[in-house]
C-alpha cells in the first residue's frame, strides 16, 4: 500500500507497522491515506480492547496496556476496527483509535499496532513551530514515546508467557530502540529515551515516496512552510 503524501505541514509524521506506514494529519495518526469511517462507541465497563477476544487475550497479559486502555476509555476514547485497507489511527481530537480491518485476523499484529497507537494517545504531543529543530525533534519524540510504549507492552506480554508482538519500525533499528529503552529503565530519564529513539527513527526510517530519512523529510517540510526560516 502506498501512502499519499500531502505538502501541508500538518501532515507530518509516518512510522512503519507491519510493512505499512502511519501518517500524521494534525493530531491524527493513520495508516495508508484513507481516513477511517465514523467511530462507534468504545467498550464500557472495563479495560477491554474492543477488538475481539483474540486481542483481548494478548493485551490482558500486559498490565500497562490494561491500565492505559482503562484510562483512555474513562477519558472518553473509543477503540474499534475500521474498513479493510482504511488504515490505523490515533486521533487526539476525536479521542478515537481505529485499527485497519485487515488486522482482525491477526491478534498479535493488532496488539502491536494498538500498543503503538496507545503510546501516541497517551503522549501529550503539541507541534512546536518555534524553530526547525524544535519541530523536527518534537515529531520524532512523539514517535519515541509510541515506540517506548510498544516495547514496554511487548516485554510484559512475553514475560507473562504470551506471544512476541514485535516492535513497529524498521527491524534494523530495533536494537537501538531496545538499548534506549533499557537505559531508561536504569536512569528513569524518559525524555532522553524518547530523544534517542527519535534520533534513530529520524535517521533510520526512510520515506517510501522520497527516499529521505524522516528527519530530513520533516525538516524539508518546515523549510517549505516557513520559507527557509530556522
Task: Locate each region found by the language model.
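Solvent-exposed, acidic/flexible segments
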Residues: 58, 103-115, 135-143
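Intrinsically disordered, low-complexity proline/glycine-rich segments
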Residues: 1-47
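Substrate-binding clefts and substrate-entry loops adjacent to catalytic sites
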Residues: 100, 122-137
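A metal-dependent hydrolase signature that marks the N-terminal structural subdomain at the beginning
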Residues: 47-80
Amino acid at each position: 500500500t502506498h501512502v499519499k503524501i500531502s505538502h501541508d505541514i500538518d501532515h507530518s509524521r509516518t512510522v512503519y507497522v507491519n510493512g505499512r506506514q502511519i501518517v500524521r494529519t494534525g493530531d491524527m495518526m493513520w495508516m495508508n491515506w484513507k481516513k477511517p469511517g465514523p467511530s462507534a462507541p468504545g467498550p464500557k465497563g472495563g479495560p477491554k480492547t474492543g477488538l475481539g477476544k483474540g486481542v483481548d487475550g494478548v493485551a490482558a497479559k500486559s498490565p500497562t496496556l490494561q491500565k492505559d486502555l482503562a484510562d483512555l476509555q474513562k477519558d472518553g476514547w473509543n477503540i474499534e476496527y475500521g474498513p479493510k485497507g482504511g488504515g490505523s489511527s490515533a486521533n487526539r481530537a476525536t479521542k478515537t483509535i481505529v485499527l485497519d480491518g485487515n488486522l482482525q485476523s491477526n491478534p498479535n499484529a493488532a496488539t502491536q499496532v494498538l500498543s503503538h497507537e496507545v503510546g501516541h494517545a497517551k503522549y501529550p504531543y503539541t507541534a512546536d513551530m518555534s524553530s526547525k529543530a524544535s519541530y523536527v525533534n518534537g515529531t520524532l519524540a512523539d514517535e519515541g514515546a509510541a515506540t517506548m510504549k510498544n516495547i514496554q507492552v511487548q516485554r510484559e506480554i512475553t514475560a507473562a508467557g504470551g506471544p512476541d508482538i514485535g516492535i513497529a519500525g524498521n527491524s534494523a533499528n530495533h536494537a537501538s530502540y531496545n538499548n534506549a529503552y533499557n537505559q531508561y529503565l536504569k536512569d528513569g530519564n524518559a525524555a532522553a529515551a524518547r530523544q534517542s529513539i527519535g534520533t534513530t527513527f529520524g535517521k533510520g526510517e526512510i520515506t517510501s515516496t522520497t527516499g529521505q530519512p524522516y528527519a530530513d523529510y520533516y525538516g524539508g517540510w518546515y523549510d517549505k512552510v516557513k520559507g527557509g526560516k530556522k
